[in-house]
Amino acid sequence: MALRVGEIVIDCADHETVIPFWMEAMGDYVRHDVNEQFVTIAPRERGAGRPPIMFQKVPERKTAKNRVHLDLRGESMTAEVERLKGLGATFIAERTLGESTRWAVMADPEGNEFCISE
């Protein structure tokens, strides 16, 4: 039996700080308020490798580097970095692997790291 990703869960201190950012960043996602602790955003159309993202409200703020992060792809890394900065993300660094692989490390408005590549 194989497992599949049901949803990705991101801890947050304030739903209203991170959810508007992630909804804009991901595009055609809709919000589903589960309760005070959990809010999910999910693609309007399910499938195509776009799992729902659940935000779990936690009392503590982020204090260290994420042990797991999202690797997101767009048509232009440079354009996506600028777009996401305009939405409230922070650019952390650009990384390369060899001559042909590069990505940008970024953080959402609460400091949760993610990467952007082409």
Language model features with spans:
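Short beta-turn/strand-loop junction motif enriched in small, turn-promoting residues
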Residues: 27-28, 58
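K/E-rich alpha-helical interaction surfaces of small helical-bundle regulatory domains
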Residues: 17-27
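Short amphipathic alpha-helices in soluble, non-transmembrane regions
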Residues: 23-24, 82-87
